[in-house]
């Protein structure tokens, strides 16, 4: 175990340092690691990969693998840093196999779940990823997990089964599921959960909603009430009403509804209703950063959503501190201290 951890630390350090000269993709199959370099490194590593392989990508923008049809894990350096030189960037991709896990990647456009040639895909995970456009599916996908992601539009509800989204920021949902395939959504920020624009509501998928910030976003304040429909269930959520002014030249383009009346049906408990500016300094941010984010047992910020927390870093070891003595000791040795952390 220690040997594997050390190899990963060395690998990750090399991958970040090599970025100055080029892009790196490292393919791990069993105990064998193979590096690939350049803008096509990801494609070359993927072509050489077999089911069960792990591909680790450095920071930088790689050429895409348009369809991922092998049961593999793909891990990037990060998806969230403002400086693109620190992100792992892909244009888009389609997930077309079971048991695919993707983590720490910034997709500029769309991630698609499933293809017309497959009856379904199962057990796929997106973790700590940011998507520029949408998470889309018009195909059956089962046991999909989205965790600690930032996604403008989720268009993957209709044919989902056991779809779980947690610790994530979503702008809005588009497309509807049914009472037979309700989702599970927890510890998320949904900016336009109830979105009333141009006399039209956005889709409001059926789900069990727990511990979320759910935004009520409208282009005017003519509708100050909303009814939560079954079979959805709502527990310990905070509803955050806000709407955009029509005067887009205003230096502060957001105004806030003083109240929204929520009509709670059965299956609802311990929900609250506050104005959006009481919980967020900046609306519509991806990912969201609520005020007074909860703390963990050691006093560190758990994440903007609570729950299991939110981290910008993927689950590969990274060096968080290092100390190297400038002089050797009496035995002629130099003390080196390295602290390594890996997210869960």
What are these regions (language model features)?
Residues 4-14:
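Sec-dependent N-terminal signal peptides
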Residues 16-20:
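Sec/Tat signal peptide C-region and signal peptidase I cleavage site
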Residues 25-63:
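Acidic Gly/Asp/Thr-rich repetitive segments characteristic of extracellular carbohydrate-active
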Residues 60-61, 78-81, 239-246, 293-300:
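Acidic glycine-/aspartate-rich tracts in secreted/extracellular proteins
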Residues 71-115, 128:
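Right-handed parallel beta-helix/beta-spiral solenoid domain characteristic of secreted/periplasmic
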Residues 102, 108-118, 126, 131-281:
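Predominantly extracellular beta-rich ligand-binding scaffolds that present long acidic/polar faces
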Residues 256-314:
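C-terminal accessory segments
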Residues 300-334, 341-343:
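Short, compositionally biased P/S/T/A/G/V-rich stretches that sit at domain boundaries
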């Amino acid at each position: 175990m220690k040997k594997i951890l050390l190899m990963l630390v060395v690998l990750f350090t090399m991958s970040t340092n090599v970025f100055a000269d080029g892009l790196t993709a490292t393919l791990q199959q069993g105990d064998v690691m193979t590096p690939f370099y350049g803008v096509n490194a990801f494609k070359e590593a993927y072509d050489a990969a077999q089911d069960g392989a792990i591909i680790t990508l450095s920071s930088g923008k790689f050429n895409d693998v348009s369809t991922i049809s092998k049961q593999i894990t793909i891990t990037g350096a990060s998806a969230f840093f403002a400086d693109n030189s620190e992100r792992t960037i892909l244009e888009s991709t389609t997930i077309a196999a079971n048991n695919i896990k993707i983590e720490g990647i910034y997709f500029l456009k769309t991630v698609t779940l499933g293809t017309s040639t497959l009856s379904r895909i199962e057990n796929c995970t997106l973790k700590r990823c940011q998507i520029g456009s949408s998470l889309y599916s018009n195909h059956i996908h089962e046991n999909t997990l989205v965790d600690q992601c930032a996604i403008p539009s989720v268009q993957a509800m209709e044919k989902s089964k056991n779809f779980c989204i947690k610790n994530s920021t979503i702008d809005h949902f588009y497309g509807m599921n049914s009472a037979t395939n309700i989702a599970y959504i927890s510890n998320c920020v949904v900016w336009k959960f109830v979105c009333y624009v141009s006399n039209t509501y956005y889709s409001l998928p059926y789900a069990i909603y727990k511990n979320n910030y759910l935004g009520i976003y409208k282009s005017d304040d003519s509708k100050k009430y909303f009814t939560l429909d079954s079979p959805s269930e709502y527990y310990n959520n905070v509803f955050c009403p806000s709407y955009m002014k029509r005067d887009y030249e205003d230096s502060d383009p957001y105004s806030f509804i003083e109240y929204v009346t929520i009509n709670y049906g059965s299956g609802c408990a311990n929900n609250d209703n506050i104005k959006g500016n009481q919980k967020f300094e900046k609306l519509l941010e991806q990912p969201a950063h609520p005020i007074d984010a909860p703390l963990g047992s050691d006093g560190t910020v758990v994440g903007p959503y609570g729950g299991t927390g939110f981290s910008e870093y993927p689950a590969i070891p990274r060096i968080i501190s290092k100390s190297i003595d400038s002089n050797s000791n009496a035995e002629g040795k130099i003390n080196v201290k390295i602290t390594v952390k890996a997210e869960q």
